[in-house]
Amino acid sequence: MAKSKIRVRYAPSPTGHLHIGNARTALFNYLFARHNKGKFILRIEDTDLKRNVKDGEKSQMDNLTWLGIDWDEGPDKGGDFGPYRQSERKSIYDPLIQQLIDEGKAYESYMTEDELSAQREAQKARKEMPHYVYEFAGMTEDEKQAKIAAAKAAGIQPVIRFHVPENTTYAWDDMVKGKVSFESKTVGGDFVIKKRDGMPTYNFAVVVDDHMMEISHVFRGDDHVANTPKQLMIYEAFGWQPPKFGHMSLIINTETGKKLSKRDETVLQFIEQYRELGYLPEAMLNFIILLGWSPVGESELFSKREFIKMYDEKRLSKSPAAFDGKKLEWVNNQYIKKADENEVFAMSIRQLIKAGRLPQRPDMSQIEWTRTLVSLFKNQMSYTGQIVDLADLFFNGPADINDEAKAELDNDTALPVLKEFRQRIEDIDVFEATAIQKTIKSIQKDTKIKGRALYMPIRIAVSHEMHGPELPETIELLGRETTKKHLDAMIAELAK
């Protein structure tokens, strides 16, 4: 197919926030379209009215935009193939369903949910795979019409079922998995294409929409493989050419070794959650691309532009993709390190305000102090939300000192160093890191105490920690009075 004819889509249901797996589906379709100079379409599959949530569509769009994924056609942009919400396309679906009924390829089914449930339970008891059994089997036409009349009189709304062809093989050359085939007898019998509420089912609407919107390629999750033979049956019934299919591997939680599930609470799974924690969109996009796709070479960090240029669907993996939270933190840390200082500052100060560490409207002195604070911890943060805990010393004072730190002060030089430093910081004119460093160096020159023996007692005294950011900068941010307070407390403790 010519590149100019390439049209792909991402078609979420507005039933909640953007999930990692769905974000990957959107991203791989987006990259395929952009690499091949094709079109990327956003379509909203909102036919499951009971499961749709308020603002679900908006949430999907907001998070896609945040990730840097834009679309050429969609409910907000329009296009030549709209409407782009399935709930607005009923007038397109209904005549096509009627066409199938008229051609004997679909029919009204009046079995109630209780009857269907009883049928499934009986099949399970016989150790059979649950499947729909034609409800009018063995009936004469008069008996069939009598049953339908009784159902209508009882107020039962029918569903429309598609008549599954017997003894037929449905196969396709999957762009990821290779050759895949299903026997028609394995799909669970005649399946519903129109629900009792009058809305089409997913498997019917998706075929109609993909055909009408001239979708050329469909990249989606491996969990859709079982839907594909049903969809191929509908394509065949209408005499339409199906698109090329590619089913991407499952995403596995490395902590549990199981498929990433929305019920899995061991890992955050929604893009919104990572936004709130302070992950960078470029880092999230980079990480998600690596879930089932690999670039040539050893490097893993690329810009969106670079990914678009190098993207090759043949490098999609057949093996499950491992969702590794530690890897995500590493990727995001790399992006934070090279990110614009102002961007990281803006994200970090929002986190501090949200946590109540700063007022809703900080004054200029608080803003400048926070700017220095963020620069101090910038390279340590895996995500900007960590600034709240990393900087806890500056808001809540030192945590309890541990035994290892106490042992570090159990020597003959710790107390003299602290006393000297406490005395000399009184003489610092401008209390900033450069002057503080000179003061520490002057103690080294005068006492001959240096290295760990010099710096560690001061660090432990002011922070109760053995490790942390640059000591002079830490002391500058604490301020002269707070530093004196911490030093006095430790000197008193060691003098006992």
UniProtKB/Swiss-Prot annotation:
It is found in: Cytoplasm. GO terms for biological process: glutamyl-tRNA aminoacylation. GO terms for cellular component: cytosol. It is an enzyme of class 6 (ligase). It comes from the Bacteria. GO terms for molecular function: ATP binding; glutamate-tRNA ligase activity; tRNA binding; zinc ion binding. A motif ('HIGH' region) lies at residues 12-22. Monomer. Catalyzes the attachment of glutamate to tRNA(Glu) in a two-step reaction: glutamate is first activated by ATP to form Glu-AMP and then transferred to the acceptor end of tRNA(Glu). Belongs to the class-I aminoacyl-tRNA synthetase family. Glutamate--tRNA ligase type 1 subfamily. HAMAP family: Glu_tRNA_synth_type1 (MF_00022). This is Glutamate--tRNA ligase.
